[in-house]
Amino acid sequence: MIAAANTVADRVHEVERSFTVGKAFGVTGKPGPLRVFPDAAKVAELRQRIDAGPFVAVHISARRPAQRWPLERYAQQIGQLSAERKVMLLWAPGARDNPRHPGDDKVAAEIVRTVKGAAVVPVETPDLKTLIAALSLAERVICPDGGAMHLAAALGKPVVALFGDSPIERWRPWGVPHRVLRPESRNLADLPLEPVVAACGELMHPGEAQYHR
């Protein structure tokens, strides 16, 4: 499922590239894990609004078409996941045709309608504070390559990352157990359900998960 990176530069992770800036200030060694800290008040607010966990978070939004997994497969995946854990459905609110920041209100609503009766908690994320707080409540995160994926890694969450046309070695989750999936076409429309379900199962127990390098 995983294709080779396009260029030599793309084989170096962005964290490692950024870390080299510190050499000018005497910073040496290897970069550690990313860290971001959720707002305690926002976390408490979310805990009051949603059911008790544990949760698997599924974030569905992506800017580029090649990074969007089809609605039907998200719904199938969520239906299967909800048999073992409650699923927190996350998305960027707004309209898909917004040229500046495509949103997924309609897609999220259709997924909720399709999986009616499953243990799904929809949580729209209108800002970074809400997104970070919601991700912090999850045991595992399934999402396309993008900002939510990197925030999940910075929160120390095991991640199943769905990659389309971006370089894996440069942008994969950093410093956490993860699985990366990408079809040969580099378009998530061609990624079947089965390998995603299998990857989620592999990360069921974070202590047993392996890093993909």
Role assignments for model-derived ranges:
Residues 1-213:
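Catalytic machinery of carbohydrate-active enzymes
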